Amino acid sequence: MVPDSTTILHHSITLNLFSDYHSHPQGHRVQRYTQALLQPWIDSARAKGILDIAFTDHDRYHGGVDFDELDRLRERNPDVRIRAGIELDNDPETSAAGRKWVEQNWKRLDFVLGSVHYLNRADQMFDSVPEGAQQFTGRDIDDVYSDYFRRVREMAASGLIDCLAHLDLVKIHGYRPRAQVTELVEETLELIRARNLAIELSTAGWRKPVNELYPSDEIILFAMEKKIPFTIASDAHSWAQLGENYERLRQKITSFGLREVCVYEKHKRIVRRL
């Protein structure tokens, strides 16, 4: 279901982080989409120069997503490209229902993120702060990383996503493997490339204990070598967090020599130069 074609649009613009492709208007509970809920997100995005935004609530809250309400929001805000999205997770309790919902609504969705938040505990996301750190205590960290990236590959192979979210989320609590992370992630990057998927550059890591961009510099450069495309995102759980730390992200992107990011419309990847 992931498209094969890529449209490239060339724009002569100054480096401008114009998109945010990971946002959660519902937060951490079901809240039915309404204009009152969504319009503040568009107002915040516009004020920050973000004119292409994807709403990607967690799939377990798909009951709150209303495509007709998104159409009304687009009519009210023709200057902002508003994408219908979802974040598909590996939650042991809800992922089956989430995948079914994505399949049923694929044609109405513009963009699907894939993520891994669960390891060996079905009752707790490993990235919960601070309690999730307990899942790393006493374990071989290289084994944890290997297990995590195995689950990421399962998500990448699902055929139901366009992009991988916070690719090295496993580092969130600051635990580091003994092996080079590029060795641990190479098989995953090869699959991402083979499946024609993108990787998200997420500023959310800067507000977590690890205090780093997702993914790491090493992984970004490795992905660039493999010509894997990127989206940019804040993983905002409130409208105030949209575009958070984008100035730091701009500096990173400049240092990497990265000059294009991608956006999506009905799962068609559009590469835009910065």
Regions of interest found by a model, annotated:
Residues P3-P92, A96-Q104, K171-E183, E187, ...:
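An N-terminally biased module of ancient metal coordination in phosphate/nucleic-acid-related enzymes
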Residues A45, V112, H166, I199, ...:
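Conserved, mostly hydrophobic/aromatic
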Residues R46, A156-A157, M224, T254:
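Non-catalytic positions within long, well-ordered alpha-helices that form the structural scaffold/packing
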Residues L51-D52, D110, D162, R259:
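Short acidic/polar active-site loop segments enriched in Thr and Asp
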Residues V65-R195:
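Extended substrate/RNA-proximal surfaces in nucleic-acid metabolism proteins
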Residues Q180-L242, R259:
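Active-site-adjacent C-terminal substructures of enzyme catalytic domains
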Residues K227-I232, E247-R269:
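His/Asp/Glu-enriched, well-ordered alpha-helical/loop segment
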